[in-house]
Regions:
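Cell-envelope and extracellular/periplasmic
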Residues: 1-373
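Short, solvent-exposed loop/linker segments at the N-terminal edge
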Residues: 270-274, 392-398
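Ser/Thr/Gly/Pro-rich low-complexity, disordered linker/stalk segments of secreted
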Residues: 371-389, 395
């Protein structure tokens, strides 16, 4: 007696993509269709409303060119990453993309009724994973968000943004207990309703989340080509590059496979000043200049490195293994801070590691004096928190 006939059944690994529009990663210019494959799946969709997610009880072959309200959408870089994992390991991949464009980090927090209600973004994502029985199967979570917290009306302090994200990690670990790693795409210089001071705060918060937590990696997006709206990305050299860059990290962190060297973005670990010589130490094995035109690269460095003392400029530079040494036009005044903002996507305009990955942006690090109000946090690995992060709520509970 045949009770039910089931075909096209797969079993594999699960990843979550979350954030705002650059996590939704809709098609702006160029299709991701070449990455579609029968072994990449999406349940329902990352719908922005309750009724839509409740009414769509379908599994789809993953596609990347739709939007939040398109059934089966994984986002362009979510789809590309899934295909890369599948091709490398012969493992089917399910992507749960919960992104919602234009939303601040507060929007993604877990409400008290998330188990019983799909009115919230958190509740809708939880519903999809609970309905499919895959809550315990999530291996990793990838996050691209920050622009909505970097504008004139919704700025968060560095500590506020960090706390919101660490709260999310705590909730995600409770609800999806087998998440092994988190991947942050650092917000880049952009329009998107942002301003310069807001971007500095968000980027520094994201950097410190990676510095201070063992299970968080960060990937800069300076090296991605920006769409004409100076906010989103085309597919080629944009969203596809999101996947290409993060794929080797996923392979190493989650699957234990090393596919290439220099897969992590260079992070500042120390900064020191002697007269007009500024030394920036990174955790990279070696730094690389990608431009034989020294004058052009110095011009780029002057655009990327922003001193609070605007009379300071860079007149020369030297690379010494993992160290970038800048010669300044004068000794900085007392309480001078330095930020690296990252403007150009061109390889030749950036100091990178051996794989062409540029520096992680940092904000308002003190190079002379005490610099009250600067982040001043150059934590090293030994200061990192354990992989499962516990954060107190307003009542002192964890």
């Amino acid at each position: 007696l045949l009770i039910q006939d089931i075909d096209d059944l797969v079993a594999g690994d699960v990843f979550i993509v979350q954030g705002q529009s650059n996590a939704a990663a809709v098609m702006y210019n160029g299709s991701s269709g070449a990455y579609q494959n029968d072994y990449l799946r999406v349940y329902s969709g990352g719908y922005t409303g309750s009724s839509s997610v409740l009414s769509d009880d379908n599994w789809y072959y993953a596609q990347g060119d739709g939007n939040e309200n398109t059934g089966g959408n994984a986002g362009q870089w979510g789809l590309a990453l899934a295909k890369m994992i599948k091709d490398q390991l012969n493992i089917p991949i399910a992507i749960f993309n919960g992104a919602h464009g234009g939303q601040p980090i507060e929007f993604f927090q877990r409400p008290s009724d998330y188990i019983s209600s799909t009115d919230s973004n958190y509740g809708r994502l939880f519903y999809r994973l609970q309905k499919t029985g895959l809550k315990e199967k999530v291996r990793g979570l990838l996050w691209s968000q920050g622009e909505a917290n970097a504008g004139a009306t919704n700025n968060l302090s560095i500590e506020q943004y960090k706390t919101y994200f660490e709260n999310l990690m705590m909730f995600w670990q409770q609800d999806y207990p087998n998440i092994e790693h988190y991947y942050l795409f650092q917000t880049r210089e952009c329009n998107c309703g942002t301003n310069s001071s807001g971007r500095l705060l968000v980027k520094e918060a994201q950097r410190l989340l990676a510095v201070e937590n063992n299970n968080v990696n960060i990937m800069p997006t300076t090296g991605m080509q920006v769409h004409s709206d100076y906010c989103h990305y085309p597919f080629v050299n944009g969203y596809e590059k999101f996947a290409l860059r993060i794929f080797p990290q996923v392979m190493k962190d989650i699957y234990g496979l090393t596919l290439q060297e220099s897969i992590y973005a260079p992070m500042i670990t120390d900064i020191s000043l002697s007269g007009n010589i500024l030394e920036i130490q990174t955790d990279s094995e070696s730094l690389v200049s990608n431009n034989s035109n020294t004058t052009a690269l110095i011009n780029s460095l002057n655009n990327d490195f922003v001193f609070s003392d605007s009379s300071i400029s860079i007149v020369n530079f030297q690379l010494d293994s993992s160290k970038l040494i800048l010669t300044l036009n004068q000794n900085p005044s007392n309480n001078t801070t330095l930020s690296f903002i990252g403007l150009s996507s061109n390889l030749e305009d950036n100091i990178t590691n051996g794989s062409g990955i540029e520096l992680v942006s940092f904000s308002n690090l003190c190079i002379s004096g005490n610099c009250d109000g600067s982040s001043g946090q150059n934590s090293t690995d030994q200061d990192k928190k354990p992989a499962i992060v516990f954060v107190e709520d307003g009542s002192g509970n964890v």
